[in-house]
């Protein structure tokens, strides 16, 4: 990826990085790569056990 227009403030960049990280985690959950819940209120990810191991 290339970074263009670095005129954003550090706070803006942190928010973008957090949102990008959230999207990556969400995609991994949807793809079944990890089992987790995202609490958007506090920005935390709770990892769950793989339900397949109990079948």
Curated annotation (Swiss-Prot):
It is found in: Cytoplasm; Nucleus. It comes from the Eukaryota. Belongs to the CSN3 family. It holds the Pfam family PCI. Keywords: Cytoplasm, Developmental protein, Nucleus, Phytochrome signaling pathway, Signalosome. Its main location: cytoplasm. Component of the CSN complex, probably composed of CSN1, CSN2, CSN3, CSN4, CSN5 (CSN5A or CSN5B), CSN6 (CSN6A or CSN6B), CSN7 and CSN8. InterPro entries: CSN3, PCI_dom, WH-like_DNA-bd_sf, WH_DNA-bd_sf. Component of the COP9 signalosome complex (CSN), a complex involved in various cellular and developmental processes such as photomorphogenesis and auxin and jasmonate responses. The CSN complex is an essential regulator of the ubiquitin (Ubl) conjugation pathway by mediating the deneddylation of the cullin subunits of SCF-type E3 ligase complexes, leading to decrease the Ubl ligase activity of SCF. It is involved in repression of photomorphogenesis in darkness by regulating the activity of COP1-containing Ubl ligase complexes. The keyword Cytoplasm applies. Residues 1-52 form the PCI domain. This is COP9 signalosome complex subunit 3. It comes from Brassica oleracea. GO terms for cellular component: COP9 signalosome; cytoplasm. One of its GO terms (biological process) is red, far-red light phototransduction.
């Amino acid at each position: 990826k290339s970074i263009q227009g670095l005129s954003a403030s550090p706070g803006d960049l942190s928010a973008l990085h957090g949102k990008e990280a959230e999207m990556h985690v969400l995609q991994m959950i949807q793809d079944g790569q990890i089992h987790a819940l995202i609490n958007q209120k506090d920005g935390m990810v709770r990892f769950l056990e793989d339900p397949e191991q109990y079948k």
